[in-house]
Design a protein with these regions (language model features):
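Flexible glycine-rich, low-complexity coil/linker segments exposed to the extracellular/periplasmic environment
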Residues: 56-80, 250, 254-256, 260-287
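Transmembrane beta-strand segments of Gram-negative outer membrane beta-barrel proteins
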Residues: 31-78, 82, 108-112
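Extracellular loop and loop/strand-boundary signature of outer-membrane beta-barrel proteins
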Residues: 79-84, 144-149, 207-211, 275-280
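Gram-negative bacterial Sec-dependent N-terminal signal peptides
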Residues: 1-26
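Outer membrane beta-barrel
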Residues: 104-259
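Transmembrane beta-barrel domains of outer membrane proteins
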Residues: 31, 95-101, 163-165, 226-228, ...
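Cleaved targeting-peptide boundary
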Residues: 24-37, 174-175
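Hydrophobic, lipid-facing positions within transmembrane beta-strands of outer-membrane proteins
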Residues: 38, 90-96, 155-160, 219-223, ...
Length: 296
């Protein structure tokens, strides 16, 4: 299974031409009473990416005698759906943020986004030598319904939380957040470590031209506390009351490396036209995720 996945990445990482344009549509700060304010910001982004090389023939039509045959036919829809010169992204997105502080130290923060990617609303370029080697039940020349929905456009609320900043002493202060937000205590260069467990990631957005870090970290419903004892010591903790899964590349989308995983995935193939249908995901309970930390 690993060989075809590596081949797919090796091809796609060097075979793209991308362009992105980002513009702040509106940004204002409106006074609210004597101490409060409402600050809002809307950012529009347009990104386009094009495939510059043809799909690898070994992945497109693997020989039945190939020992990696089953692995390849379950990892090639993202390759076959985009021919040389095809747009893999033609995406416009809008990100809106509203910070409403109703007193000197308390407020509500909201963030929402919407996008539309025309590349996933047309026909695919899937013309494999063998029929029925695509991993969804509809026509191979069409993206699966779940793929169109996840990669082609959606609108959703991201952050929605209350926050408060409280002075507790000459050098100490308490910050509290309640609601859906991101907690990230640290990160490393090559490995996510604790940050990878605290916040799920929307993998699709990492590969979108013009995407920013705040675009692909998924907020989670939780209560978090940051207590600065003095300028040197800080203790912190959080407890999550919501489970959110990471968003994998949609099956058949360009960056997908497993046709049976992610939105739009419908079956695992053993041979052209023969396989197992994919069932619903089994989700864990919403509780049990918490953490305590200290920083010096």
């Amino acid at each position: 299974m690993q060989a075809p996945l590596r081949s797919h990445f090796a091809l796609t990482l060097v075979a793209l031409a991308t362009s992105a344009f980002t513009s702040t549509v509106a940004a204002h700060n409106v006074p609210l009473g004597e101490e409060g304010f409402v600050r809002y910001n809307f950012t529009a982004n347009y990104g386009v990416a094009k495939r510059l090389e043809a799909p690898d023939a070994a992945m497109a039509s693997p020989a039945a005698a190939d020992p990696l045959y089953v692995g390849k036919i379950n990892a090639n829809d993202g390759d076959l759906n985009f021919k040389k010169g095809a747009l893999i992204n033609n995406r416009v997105s809008l990100l809106g943020e509203v910070d409403a502080r109703y007193s000197a130290n308390q407020g509500v923060f909201l963030r929402a986004q919407a996008f539309y990617d025309a590349a996933y609303h047309g026909r695919t370029d899937n013309n494999a030598a063998f029929p029925n080697t695509d991993n969804h039940a509809s026509n191979a020349a069409e993206f699966a319904r779940g793929t169109r929905r996840a990669a082609g456009g959606e609108a959703e609320f991201l952050d929605a939380y209350w926050y408060g900043d409280f002075k507790t002493g000459d050098e100490s202060a308490l910050n509290v957040k309640v609601g859906r937000h991101v907690v990230q205590w640290g990160e490393s260069l090559f490995f996510a470590n604790i940050a990878g467990a605290q916040s799920p990631v929307d993998v699709n957005k990492i590969n979108v031209p013009g995407a920013q870090v705040k675009d692909f970290l998924l907020p989670v419903g939780q209560v978090s506390v940051n207590y600065s004892l003095n300028p040197k010591w800080t203790v912190m903790g959080y407890a999550q009351y919501e489970f959110r899964e990471a968003k994998l590349p949609a099956a058949g989308s360009f960056w997908s490396v497993a046709d049976f995983l992610g939105p739009g995935a419908e079956r695992f193939l053993f041979a052209p036209g023969f396989g197992l249908s994919r069932g619903n995901d089994i989700k864990p309970s919403a509780g049990g995720q918490w953490g305590l930390g200290a920083r010096y």
